[in-house]
């Protein structure tokens, strides 16, 4: 057998043991998503490969490209949720876009490069949030001092006297000892008053007190939003915002509570403490090394092969695919924060492919998504597990909401199975929208309860322990399921 040469010239580092293994990643995804093991395994391997790439030598690192994934399956089976949860696990910048919203360069609409600009914005916000947490404690102390300065303005002349040197003080003493004693006394009174006020601020006893604060008035803020929706106009909007931000801002005085002033001042102090150049640098690195772009509805830009030749909308669809090619393959995209290389951004595409097929994508784009995973339609048993097992299960959400009204809501196992059976049946007879069907069914099932509970609790006309059984489910939903027209519009 012919073996490739051993990579002796490429030293590697071992991956930190604290990093998630593919098995652990799948276990984490299992907490929120039922089934779809093939898709989970594929994204887990892709995430682990990123860690592996970051630990090889720099020379070889640039040669290792991500294995982009295309997920094929009907709506509501977990495609988007898998990608979103994966990004949270990886603590990576993540953006979800819809392929059908993009247009070919030269047409009115968003161009494909905007997805990378959105990803960079997401990364900057993420890093800024991390840095904010790091400086929040220091910012809180600075805000406290500023609030004390507003509540107890320093007495004129005290600050200067605090910095007087020994020799100068000696001269002052000889000149007028009484003035020095009086200033020292005022300084001590001010210090004690300030300490008492500080304690009251920390205890939260002054949060409702009104103070006057000088704030910047953002007169031009809303003006820039008109540039947003159109492709190239986004760049113009960014340039205009940068120009406006360089102009001196008007300041005006506003009356507000200390609680409101604290939030405003904290934002100001955090901005002063954070080095935005470092934030942008870190954000760009995160995008290039660990960014994830989820392209939904990619089947909408795949033109079915009909033998009619590319005409009408098919030409534009193919144009979008060709515009996507360099982005997915790896190119440099200009953003307002700098140039970003997309060579190692992970792209996960998804589509139902009811009409078109993956083979209807242009061959070059197919080659950029080497891993294909088919997600299965959800069964009645899957619906039952979705309602009971995930940490964010719908039934748990409704129970938590009604707890706020002092109501304990319970579902019998038979009731949950009846809900699952109803969801599966409606998906078969009307249109298969996957797990999203459970939202509409539970909303209709609990509508009267959710509407009338506040008054019934106040009147004492309701049992605090409510149990939903299968008979109630059939009684409430039976007619809707039986009538195809009703279920089509209501469920």
UniProtKB/Swiss-Prot annotation:
One of its GO terms (molecular function) is peptidase activity. SUPFAM superfamilies: P-loop containing nucleoside triphosphate hydrolases. Keywords: ATP-binding, Chaperone, Cytoplasm, Nucleotide-binding. InterPro entries: AAA+_ATPase (IPR003593), ATP-dep_Clp_protease_ClpX (IPR050052), ATPase_AAA_core (IPR003959), Clp_ATPase_C (IPR019489), HslU (IPR004491), P-loop_NTPase (IPR027417). Gene3D superfamilies: 1.10.8.60, DNA helicase RuvA subunit, C-terminal domain, P-loop containing nucleotide triphosphate hydrolases. It comes from the Bacteria. It is found in: Cytoplasm. ATP binds at residues 34, 76-81, 296, 364, 436. CDD domains: RecA-like_HslU (cd19498). One of its GO terms (biological process) is protein unfolding. Pfam families: AAA, AAA_2. One of its GO terms (cellular component) is HslUV protease complex. NCBIfam families: hslU (TIGR00390), PRK05201.1 (NF003544). A double ring-shaped homohexamer of HslV is capped on each side by a ring-shaped HslU homohexamer. The assembly of the HslU/HslV complex is dependent on binding of ATP. ATPase subunit of a proteasome-like degradation complex; this subunit has chaperone activity. The binding of ATP and its subsequent hydrolysis by HslU are essential for unfolding of protein substrates subsequently hydrolyzed by HslV. HslU recognizes the N-terminal part of its protein substrates and unfolds these before they are guided to HslV for hydrolysis. Belongs to the ClpX chaperone family. HslU subfamily. This is ATP-dependent protease ATPase subunit HslU. It comes from Chlorobaculum tepidum (strain ATCC 49652 / DSM 12025 / NBRC 103806 / TLS) (Chlorobium tepidum). The gene is hslU.
């Amino acid at each position: 057998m012919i073996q490739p040469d051993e990579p002796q010239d490429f030293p590697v580092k071992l991956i930190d043991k604290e990093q998630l293994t593919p098995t652990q990643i799948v276990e984490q995804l299992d907490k929120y998503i039922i089934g779809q093991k093939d898709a989970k395994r594929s994204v887990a391997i892709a995430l682990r490969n990123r860690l592996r790439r970051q630990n090889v030598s720099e020379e070889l690192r640039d040669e290792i490209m991500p294995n982009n994934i295309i997920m094929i399956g009907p709506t509501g089976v977990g495609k988007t949720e898998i990608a979103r949860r994966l990004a949270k696990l990886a603590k990576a910048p993540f953006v979800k876009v819809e392929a059908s919203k993009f247009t070919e360069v030269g047409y009115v609409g968003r161009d494909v490069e905007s997805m990378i600009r959105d990803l960079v914005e997401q990364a900057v916000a993420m890093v800024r949030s991390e840095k904010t947490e790091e400086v929040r404690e220091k910012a809180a102390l600075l805000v406290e001092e500023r609030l004390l300065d507003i509540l107890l303005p320093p007495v004129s002349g005290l600050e200067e006297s605090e910095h007087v040197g020994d020799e100068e003080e000696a001269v002052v003493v000889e000149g007028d000892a009484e003035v020095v004693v009086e200033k020292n006394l005022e300084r001590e009174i001010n210090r004690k008053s300030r300490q008492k006020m500080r304690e009251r601020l920390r205890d939260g006893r002054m949060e409702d007190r009104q103070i006057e604060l000088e704030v910047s008035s953002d007169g031009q803020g809303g003006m820039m939003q008109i540039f947003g929706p159109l492709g190239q106009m986004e760049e113009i909007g960014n340039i205009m915002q940068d120009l406006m931000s360089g102009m001196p801002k008007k300041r005006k005085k506003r009356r507000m509570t200390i609680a409101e002033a604290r939030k405003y001042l904290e934002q100001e102090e955090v901005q002063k403490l954070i080095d935005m150049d470092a934030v942008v640098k870190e954000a760009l690195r995160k995008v290039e090394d660990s960014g994830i772009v989820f392209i939904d509805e990619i089947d909408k830009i795949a033109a079915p092969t009909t033998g009619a030749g590319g005409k009408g909308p098919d030409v534009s669809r193919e144009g979008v695919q060709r515009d996507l090619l360099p982005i997915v393959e790896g190119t440099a995209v200009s953003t307002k924060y700098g140039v970003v290389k997309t060579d190692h951004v992970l792209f996960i595409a998804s589509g139902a492919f009811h009409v078109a097929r993956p083979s209807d994508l242009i061959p070059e784009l197919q080659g950029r998504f080497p891993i294909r995973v088919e997600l299965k339609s959800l069964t009645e048993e899957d619906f039952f597990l979705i309602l009971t097992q995930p940490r964010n299960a719908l039934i748990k959400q409704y129970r938590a909401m009604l707890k706020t009204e002092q109501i304990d809501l319970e579902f019998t196992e038979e009731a949950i199975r009846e809900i699952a059976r109803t969801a599966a049946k409606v998906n078969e007879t009307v249109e298969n929208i996957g797990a999203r069907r459970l939202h509409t069914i539970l909303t209709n099932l609990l509508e009267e309860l959710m509407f009338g509970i506040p008054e019934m609790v106040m009147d004492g006309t309701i049992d605090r322990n409510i149990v939903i059984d299968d008979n109630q489910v059939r009684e409430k939903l039976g007619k809707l399921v039986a009538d195809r027209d009703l279920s089509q519009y209501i469920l």
